[in-house]
């Protein structure tokens, strides 16, 4: 006998007498909640960068063109740059003799290379608008590079938006034409490449490219040297403590400095070094944004300069041992052990570095090192804001404080940079802002990496 139900398809749905098809229920109409959800997504979800960042770049491109067309160009240093270029074009190679309306040439040869191009583009001083166009493009390209860094670091759009809000920064680029903007371009590229190396565990050639970009930044203006401790530590970690590869990166940096300055090295090497890398150069007190709370006599005193340098080194060392260096290396014994391994195995890689250092830690090393240098800078002029403004969205995100406080901090910081002329109130507030943010990043920012048990284990270089 065939059992009842044997012919029924297994798993076929059946509807009993008491079962009815479910009635379709429309989702609730909650437009305000939907708007709030969309706002929260666009502000706080890093995935929304794919939407927000292209829009912000487009808006900035439009804004920069509007500023260029509606706000008058302000002559500060561009004429002096051109006068210096004309002296070089007329055959002068002694850096100590190259001068412009605002004083002697005090920037390395990368600056000369770039402004030779601008002399051709703008026909000297005849077509300043052509130079402004290039600086407008430079601003947008630099912003794109910086947004790429933000994306790799998962910085939410709510913080990334701080990168485009500075009135002073817009002026520095398209209305002033300062060389600081090109240093920022190459420094941003260097940071981007280093972050990529850490995120995707890429070594070798790409690290060399990052080192090259860094050297290019230094060859335009010395402020990039504020990154130097962080760059050296980054190379050390990315190259897995391989002594040979580290030296190779350093050699690439030096080679670029030599190549770009060949016309001046050949005839007046000492004059070039003394002028292009003059660490004792005095700054003008009246343009110092950060030290108006002290007297001019103090500002110019070498003892004040030395105290700033000592303070810079002390804070840097504290960060190195508590936040930057991997935890199993930040003791004398750990440093001695890894140093010995470097000497005994100069062509091999320490395993722990590549396994433990991530993109966020590399960015922390680079950005915080620069920010410490800014805090203790002997002088900050208005154009120097470009040195570190682009890092503020990342630092504010790392500070891990309520967003309204970040907004208040940023508005206060921006007021300091737009207060004209420089004054004691703005200088004091600027130091309060930068010190508080650095402290927050120290206490609440990303932790330093922890190396594994095999901290000095080496493997053959790939």
UniProtKB/Swiss-Prot annotation:
GO biological process: protein glycosylation
Main location, first listed in the record: endoplasmic reticulum
Pathway in which the depicted protein is active: Protein modification; protein glycosylation
Superkingdom, natural source: Eukaryota
Cell compartment(s), UniProt: Endoplasmic reticulum membrane
Keyword Zinc: no
Presence of the UniProt keyword Transferase in the record: yes
Catalysed transformations (reactions): an alpha-D-Man-(1->2)-alpha-D-Man-(1->2)-alpha-D-Man-(1->3)-[alpha-D-Man-(1->6)]-beta-D-Man-(1->4)-beta-D-GlcNAc-(1->4)-alpha-D-GlcNAc-diphospho-di-trans,poly-cis-dolichol + a di-trans,poly-cis-dolichyl beta-D-mannosyl phosphate = an alpha-D-Man-(1->2)-alpha-D-Man-(1->2)-alpha-D-Man-(1->3)-[alpha-D-Man-(1->3)-alpha-D-Man-(1->6)]-beta-D-Man-(1->4)-beta-D-GlcNAc-(1->4)-alpha-D-GlcNAc-diphospho-di-trans,poly-cis-dolichol + a di-trans,poly-cis-dolichyl phosphate + H(+)
Membrane-spanning residues: 145-165, 177-197, 218-238, 244-264, 307-327, 357-377, 391-411
Primary role: Dol-P-Man:Man(5)GlcNAc(2)-PP-Dol alpha-1,3-mannosyltransferase that operates in the biosynthetic pathway of dolichol-linked oligosaccharides, the glycan precursors employed in protein asparagine (N)-glycosylation. The assembly of dolichol-linked oligosaccharides begins on the cytosolic side of the endoplasmic reticulum membrane and finishes in its lumen. The sequential addition of sugars to dolichol pyrophosphate produces dolichol-linked oligosaccharides containing fourteen sugars, including two GlcNAcs, nine mannoses and three glucoses.
Family to which the UniProt record says this protein belongs: Belongs to the glycosyltransferase ALG3 family.
Protein name (record): Dol-P-Man:Man(5)GlcNAc(2)-PP-Dol alpha-1,3-mannosyltransferase
Organism: Kluyveromyces lactis (strain ATCC 8585 / CBS 2359 / DSM 70799 / NBRC 1267 / NRRL Y-1140 / WM37) (Yeast)
Gene of this entry: ALG3
């Amino acid at each position: 006998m065939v059992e009842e139900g044997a012919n029924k398809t297994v798993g076929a749905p059946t509807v009993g007498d008491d079962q009815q098809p479910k009635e379709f229920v429309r989702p609730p109409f909650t437009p305000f909640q939907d708007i709030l959800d969309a706002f929260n997504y666009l502000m706080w979800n890093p995935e929304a960068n794919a939407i927000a960042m292209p829009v912000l770049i487009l808006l900035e491109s439009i804004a920069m063109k509007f500023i260029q067309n509606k706000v008058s160009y302000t002559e500060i240093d561009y004429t002096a740059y051109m006068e210096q270029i004309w002296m070089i074009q007329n055959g002068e190679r002694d850096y100590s003799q190259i001068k412009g309306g605002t004083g002697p040439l005090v920037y390395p040869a990368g600056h000369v290379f770039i402004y030779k191009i601008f002399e051709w583009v703008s026909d000297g001083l005849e077509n300043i608008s052509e130079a402004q166009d290039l600086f407008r493009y430079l601003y947008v390209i630099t912003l794109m590079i910086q947004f790429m860094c933000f994306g790799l670091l998962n910085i939410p759009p709510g913080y990334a938006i701080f990168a485009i809000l500075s009135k002073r920064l817009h002026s520095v680029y398209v209305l002033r034409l300062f060389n600081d903007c090109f240093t920022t371009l190459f420094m941003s590229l260097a940071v981007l490449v280093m972050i990529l190396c850490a995120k995707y565990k890429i070594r070798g050639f790409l690290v060399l490219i990052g080192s090259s970009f860094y050297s290019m930044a230094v060859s335009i203006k010395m402020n990039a040297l504020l990154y130097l401790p962080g760059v050296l530590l980054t190379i050390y970690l990315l190259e897995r403590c391989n002594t040979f590869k580290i030296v190779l990166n350093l050699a690439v940096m030096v080679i670029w400095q030599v190549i770009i300055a060949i016309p001046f090295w050949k005839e007046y090497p000492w004059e070039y070094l003394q002028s292009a890398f003059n660490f004792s150069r005095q700054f003008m007190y009246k343009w110092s944004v950060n030290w108006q709370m002290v007297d001019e006599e103090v500002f110019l005193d070498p003892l004040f300069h030395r105290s700033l340098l000592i303070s810079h080194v002390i804070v840097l060392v504290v960060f190195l041992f508590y936040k930057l260096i991997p935890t199993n290396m930040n003791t004398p014994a750990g440093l001695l052990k890894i140093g010995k391994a470097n000497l005994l195995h100069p062509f091999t890689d320490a395993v722990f570095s590549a396994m433990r250092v991530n993109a966020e830690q590399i960015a922390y090393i680079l950005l915080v090192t620069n920010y410490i240098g800014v805090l203790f800078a002997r002088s900050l002029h208005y154009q120097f804001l470009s040195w570190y403004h682009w890092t503020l969205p990342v630092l504010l995100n790392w500070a891990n404080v309520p967003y309204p406080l970040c907004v208040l901090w940023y508005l206060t910081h921006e007021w300091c940079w737009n207060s004209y002329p420089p004054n004691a109130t703005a200088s004091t507030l600027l130091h309060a802002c930068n010190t508080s943010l650095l402290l927050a990043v120290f206490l609440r920012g990303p932790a330093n990496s922890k190396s594994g048990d095999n901290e000095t284990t080496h493997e053959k270089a790939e």
